[in-house]
């Protein structure tokens, strides 16, 4: 009997695939079975094309169903109304969700009927699976809380996102201002983690009251490392020697630099594994983060190298020695993007009155937690308390690639007692901050506003690269603030209490103090 039930299910699925609605399908209304989307499209006169923008939404949906318009191409077919294209795509999604829900209910009903036949001994064909009506389910309404209006989608197409159905509003807070290199700077942070902005603000306040933070840019250069294959390791070694010849490097650099006004090749590091060769190109990129710019230059450079090594196979433009969006020792040791150090001296009075702890406690905890603890965990570039928290919040606010927080959050936090143990010296060293003030999401209105807040939107025409360098300095200073504040909270035992205040819904009563464990409600990175 179980076999019969299984056959019943298979036949139902077969019928569903044929017609979209199984012959076993029963609902409160069968009007949907008579609907044919293509019936709402007027017959197109011969020799005359239809302007899609003149059609009604349902007529456009019918063309999608017929395969004449691809859902991801709605914006190109509605070039004067991208917002309408997004609305139509939402309707398509809601309808598809409705259909899938109906199919799921039908499958459940078929299984229930088969099980009933198996246990009762009845003839399976005499049992009609009954599916409850789904007309009361509003899948389009379920998208109501995903905003769609009041957004300029012309800035998204071909740049930021595909198959757009709306956008996500994220709260943006401001920390500071912090006195950075002699100027007051406010720090925009987009986050959903309560206490993060407040904590960073406290750190910025302590730094500013103590005379401010200073930064130094150690190096700047985006990297891309294609992987190539030679016939043998001997030829791979010869390629390495060829590239390391200064005259040959200049020839490759000339080809690389010809692809952009801003790209200037600085170095090529050659890494060999057997007969595989990884060529890590490093280039300046102006005010752009520069991944696309460097990739374009690499393609041109490889053409020159191939002239001298025609047997070389380029397996991939990226061979993971770059390294992008993945933890790696090479970024930690040699840098990628901007390498920045931010430092400050915090007076003992500020440590006591603002941070509510002591210099001795901070220095000791930093060694035990950020240095020894991270070493015991085998961390690569993670010798800090929560650098990625601040990096990600700043990246989202300013239109950076949030996924690059992986390498951009590489950071070692150091603390020392100075002036006879009276004051605190703190620094963060961040070798791979990947940022830009042009390209990516930096041109979106909200993100542009945050860059305006920092006075670094767009390209710096007087000194190309200056704006992106300043953004990297701001990132480092913000991380310095966040590290100082969180480490102080941990040293003073305030972490749980601060999160209970800032990281809970206001309508929810706070738990009694004696029921809170010390591990409850810790931040995502502590």
From Swiss-Prot:
Pathway: Metabolic intermediate biosynthesis; (R)-mevalonate biosynthesis; (R)-mevalonate from acetyl-CoA: step 3/3. Signal peptide: none annotated. InterPro entries: HMG_CoA_Rdtase, HMG_CoA_Rdtase_cat_sf, HMG_CoA_Rdtase_CS, HMG_CoA_Rdtase_eu_arc, HMG_CoA_Rdtase_N, HMG_CoA_Rdtase_NAD(P)-bd_sf, HMG_CoA_Rdtase_sub-bd_dom_sf. Residues 514-526 have a biased composition (Polar residues). It is an enzyme of class 1 (oxidoreductase). Pfam families: HMG-CoA_red. It catalyses: (R)-mevalonate + 2 NADP(+) + CoA = (3S)-3-hydroxy-3-methylglutaryl-CoA + 2 NADPH + 2 H(+). This is 3-hydroxy-3-methylglutaryl-coenzyme A reductase 2.
């Amino acid at each position: 009997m179980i076999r019969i039930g299984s056959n019943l299910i298979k036949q139902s699925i077969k019928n569903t695939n044929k017609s979209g609605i199984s012959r076993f399908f029963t609902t409160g209304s069968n009007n949907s079975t008579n609907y044919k989307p293509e019936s709402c499209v007027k017959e197109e006169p011969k020799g005359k094309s239809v302007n899609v923008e003149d059609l009604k939404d349902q007529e456009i949906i019918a063309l999608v169903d017929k395969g004449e318009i691809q859902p991801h191409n709605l914006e190109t077919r509605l070039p004067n109304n991208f917002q309408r294209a997004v609305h139509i795509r939402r309707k398509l999604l809601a309808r598809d969700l409705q259909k899938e829900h109906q199919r799921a209910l039908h499958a459940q009903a078929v299984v229930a009927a088969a099980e009933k036949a198996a246990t009762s001994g009845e003839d399976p064909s005499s049992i009609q699976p009954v599916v409850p009506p789904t007309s009361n389910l509003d899948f389009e309404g379920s998208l109501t809380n995903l905003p769609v209006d009041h957004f300029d989608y012309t800035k998204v197409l071909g740049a930021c996102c595909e198959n757009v159905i709306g956008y996500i509003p994220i709260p943006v807070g401001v920390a500071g201002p912090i006195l950075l290199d002699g100027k007051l700077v406010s720090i925009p942070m987009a986050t959903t983690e309560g206490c993060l902005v407040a904590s960073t603000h406290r750190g910025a306040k302590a730094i500013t009251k103590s005379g401010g933070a200073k930064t130094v840019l150690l190096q700047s250069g985006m990297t891309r490392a294609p992987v190539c294959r030679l016939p043998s390791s001997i030829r791979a070694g010869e390629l390495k020697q060829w590239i390391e010849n200064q005259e040959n490097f200049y020839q490759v650099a000339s080809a690389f630099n010809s692809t952009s006004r801003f790209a200037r090749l600085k170095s090529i590091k050659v890494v060999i594994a057997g007969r595989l060769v990884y060529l890590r190109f490093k280039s300046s990129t102006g005010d752009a983060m520069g991944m696309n710019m460097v990739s374009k230059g690499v393609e041109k450079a490889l053409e020159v190298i191939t002239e001298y090594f025609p047997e070389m196979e380029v397996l991939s433009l990226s061979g993971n020695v770059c390294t992008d969006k993945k933890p790696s020792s090479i970024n930690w040791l040699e840098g990628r993007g901007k390498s920045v150090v931010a430092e400050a001296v915090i007076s003992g009075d500020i440590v006591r009155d603002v941070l509510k702890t002591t210099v001795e406690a901070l220095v000791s905890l930093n060694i035990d937690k950020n240095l020894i603890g991270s070493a015991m965990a085998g961390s690569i570039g993670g010798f800090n308390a929560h650098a990625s928290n601040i990096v990600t919040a700043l990246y989202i606010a300013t239109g950076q690639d949030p996924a690059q927080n992986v390498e951009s959050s590489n950071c070692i936090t150091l603390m020392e007692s100075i002036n006879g143990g009276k004051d605190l010296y703190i620094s963060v060293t961040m070798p791979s901050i990947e940022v830009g003030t042009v390209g990516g999401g930096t041109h979106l209105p909200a993100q542009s506003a945050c860059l305006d807040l920092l006075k670094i939107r767009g390209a710096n025409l007087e000194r190309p690269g200056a704006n992106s360098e300043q953004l990297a300095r701001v990132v480092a200073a913000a991380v310095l603030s966040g590290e100082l504040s969180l480490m102080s909270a941990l040293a003073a035992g305030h972490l749980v209490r601060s999160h209970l205040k800032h990281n809970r819904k206001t309508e929810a009563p706070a738990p009694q103090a004696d029921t809170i464990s010390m591990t409850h409600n810790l931040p995502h990175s502590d």
